[in-house]
Every structure is written in C-alpha cells, then in structure tokens.
C-alpha cells in the first residue's frame, strides 16, 4: 500500500462502518422506545399496508361490538315494556273472567269495566311513551338495523311492532250490559296544523239523486250504515204526487262493478241517532296525497274548483269511563269535515259513495260530508264509527261533529280476544329474546375475531424486545469499537513523517 497523506482510506472505511452501526443503534432504540417494529413505511412497506388493513378491521369490529350491545339494550327496553303490558293484560283477563259471572250486578260490571278501561289506557300510555334514545319502540311498526360488522351489509334487524289496545283488538272491549249515551254534546277542539294541502272548496256537497219527476232536482240522500247494510235517507222530494218517496231506502252495492243502486220503495229502519260529541280532533302526521284527493272531490260533484286549505284530521271521543274511542279520518276545511281514508302506505283519499243517476242512467260519485243544515239529521259511517250531524246542545255540527257509538254492546268472547292479545305480545317478546341471544353470539364472535386479528397485526408490526435489545447491544459495541479504531486510523498518515527525518 502506498504511503500517502492526502487520502486516508482506512479512516474513510472506518467512518462508513461507524455510520452503519450508528444507524442500526438508532433503529434499535426507536423500536425499543415505541414498541413497534414498523414505525414508518420504510421499515416494512408491505407489512405497513397489511397492518393498516388489520387496524381498520379491528376498529370497525370493536365498534360493531358496541353497536350489538346497543341492540341488546333496545331489545331489553322493549321487552321490559312488553312485560308490563303483559301484566296489564293478565289483569284484564282476570277481570273479564270475573265479569262473566252472572252474580255480578250492573254496578259490579261498571266497576270492572272502569278498571279494564284504566288498564287498557295504561297499555296505550306504555306503548306511546316507552323509548330508547328518542326512538319510541312500541308506538309504531318499525325495523331497526344494527351494524354488527366492519363492512357494508353486515347487519341484524330488530322488528318492532306497534302494541296498544287497538292493535291488540281490545280498544272496544266492553263487559258491561249497557252503555250510557250522553245527551249533551261536548265541544270539539282543534289546533291548526302546518301540514296543509290544497283542495277545492266543498260547500254544500251532498249525494244528489236524479229523478224523472219535477221534484227530483232537489232530492238529497244522506248515507248511513247499520247491520252490514247501507241506507239513504231521502228528503226534499217536493212533487205533490210523490211526496211519499221521502224516507229511508236500502242501498245495494253491486259486487262486480261497485255501483250503488237504491230500493224503489222506502223501508222502516231505526238508524243511529244518539250521539256523543267528538272531544278531540287531532292532526294526522300522515303525508297526504293531495292530487288524488282533489281529483276525487271534483269527480264527486264539487261545484267550485277554487283552491281551499284542508287538513287531514283524526277524530276521537273519550267516554264516561275515560276510554278513548278512535274515530275515522276526515278532511277539515272551512266548509266542514269530509270523510277520508288512509291506507297502509300513508296515502289519504276522499271517501265517496257511488250511485246511479235515475235521469241519465249514468254512475256518479258523491263526497260524504260530515254535517249539514242546522237541525237536520245526517248520519255517515266511517271505518265502523257513526258520525251524527244533528244539532246538539246548541252547537252547529258544521263546525264540530259528533261521534255516535252505536255499537255499544257487550264484547262477544272477550277471553278469546284477550288470549289473542296475549299471544301477540308473547310473539313479539319471543322475537326480542331470540334477537338478544343472536346479539350475544355476534358479540362473542366479534371478540374472537378482534383477538385473532390483533395477534396477527402484532406479529407484523410489534417489536420483538429480545431481538431489538440484542441489536442495540451489538450496535453499541460496534460504535465503541468504531470510535476507537477511527482514532487509530486517523494517525496512519503520521507514519510518513518517519520517512522525512
């Protein structure tokens, strides 16, 4: 080897090795201090990508486990409410068994019915007020989707059902032998709704029946329902030769076409006249199919096509025992109340009566208006409830309709109805119990998956302290040795001085 001064190759070689050992020492210290083998992508590019995917799955599955626990909580909340409803139903059944005994006086039956009513009202309260995090669990049919996985579509559904006295078929449960009908009407109350629709003005709409005589133009027929049959009370027939045509006619509905025809002669029938007043008219939250309602009103003989504001409302009455009896739906306008119906999809439509015009022979439709002239009796049945238009307690029915509970008879087979209600509650409780077990199984599986994924990720990105401590010790020794050797390598050029002496 040549003896040179300008270039100290041994020193450069030693410095290079010293830098390597220093880098190795830094890596070992970083891994020991962080606990991670991969602190950046340069440590292991492929391993970093794999570990990152594992982290996403682990975090998602951990949250999914919490979601499943929330699902258990909402199922338990619902089941707790159903348990209380079941307790009330058991008491109602006990009272129904007691009422079936002929030794009971009317006073005894009234007391039994009063408690039954209170129990049913409590069922309705539990149904309407039980909620979990703002979700009313028994107020309506609803499906809750619980995310129990880290990816799309990994869900479990909780099917909730509306459970109240009406859906249980017990809203008209009556074990009394009589039903008191009040002679005094109670004023209806209504709060304006923000959910309005545009429909034509419907003042003075009635079902008109044409006739071949001069008196036919003024004929009006008021539609009613009793014992499974429709009747039309005809008035306004002013032909002197045919005044006996005023009266009540049976109405027949054709099975194939749905057309309505009237009997040729009046019949004697006692239509419901006793009425209790509507005590509540509430806004219905259902979205209204305004276009369909408007078209139906026009087809029903609406005279004025100018737009008017109407609101879909639902009427109800609270009887002497405190039982809320639901009425039907109606459109409330400035002209009064008009019979309406709401299907399962939430669409509202006008209820109409079909009839055949005796003059033209054509089939027509007429809207059922809940109301009429002051003092005039006009009865319309909506969804099994009878509304009476007669003037009562000095109020005008045009503004405030009355609810006549004509079917105030003792419920047939009350125990059978209550048993069916209990079975309905039991079915929902069974579903909730099954879904809770399913959630528990999902949570166990999620826990196992998280553990296995965490172990797999650990093997990729966590530091092996035995290895890293060994690497650090080796690097430290190399650093010390390198430093010592570098000092000696730097002295090698001084050997040239001996040649210059």
From Swiss-Prot:
Endpoints of the signal sequence: none
What domain of life? Bacteria
The chain's disulfide connectivity reads none
Query: What InterPro entries does the database record attribute to this sequence?
Result: Flagellin, Flagellin_C, Flagellin_C_sub2, Flagellin_D3, Flagellin_N, FLIC_barrel
| UniProt keyword terms in alphabetical order | Bacterial flagellum, Secreted
**Where does the record say this protein resides?**
Secreted; Bacterial flagellum
Q: Name one GO molecular function term.
A: structural molecule activity
Q: List, alphabetically, the Pfam families matched.
A: Flagellin_C, Flagellin_D3, Flagellin_N, FLIC_barrel
- GO cellular component annotations, sorted alphabetically? bacterial-type flagellum; extracellular region
Q: Any additional notes?
A: Individual Salmonella serotypes usually alternate between the production of 2 antigenic forms of flagella, termed phase 1 and phase 2, each specified by separate structural genes.
Q: Which NCBIfam families match?
A: PRK08026.1
Q: Which family does it belong to?
A: Belongs to the bacterial flagellin family.
Q: What does this protein do?
A: Flagellin is the subunit protein which polymerizes to form the filaments of bacterial flagella.
Q: What is this protein called?
A: Flagellin
Q: What is the native source organism of this protein?
A: Salmonella choleraesuis (strain SC-B67)
The organism's taxonomy opens as: Bacteria, Pseudomonadati, Pseudomonadota, Gammaproteobacteria, Enterobacterales
State which gene encodes it: fliC
